[in-house]
Swiss-Prot record:
It is found in: Membrane. This is Protein MANBAL. It is a single-pass membrane protein. The lineage of its organism: Eukaryota, Metazoa, Chordata, Craniata, Vertebrata. It comes from Mus musculus (Mouse). Keywords: Membrane, Transmembrane, Transmembrane helix.
Amino acid sequence: MASDLGFSPPEVPEPTFLENLLRYGLFLGAIFQLICVLAIIVPIPKSHEAEAEQAEPRSAEGPKKPKAAIASTNKRPKKETKKKR
């Protein structure tokens, strides 16, 4: 029936390589975002083995000294001078 009326199919150019790359890159980006959102929403319970491994290195390091106390002992005291007016 369309051929009887003289209609022809629309002329749509083939997508170029960059257009295809952009299209599939956007799809992959959207899928990655969905995975990230689902990872935030759905909590995954941690196993007890992973918690034990993380606790051991912390106790092996020992207590750390604050950096501020170390920095103040290394500085030389400044000379005190009176301002001349």
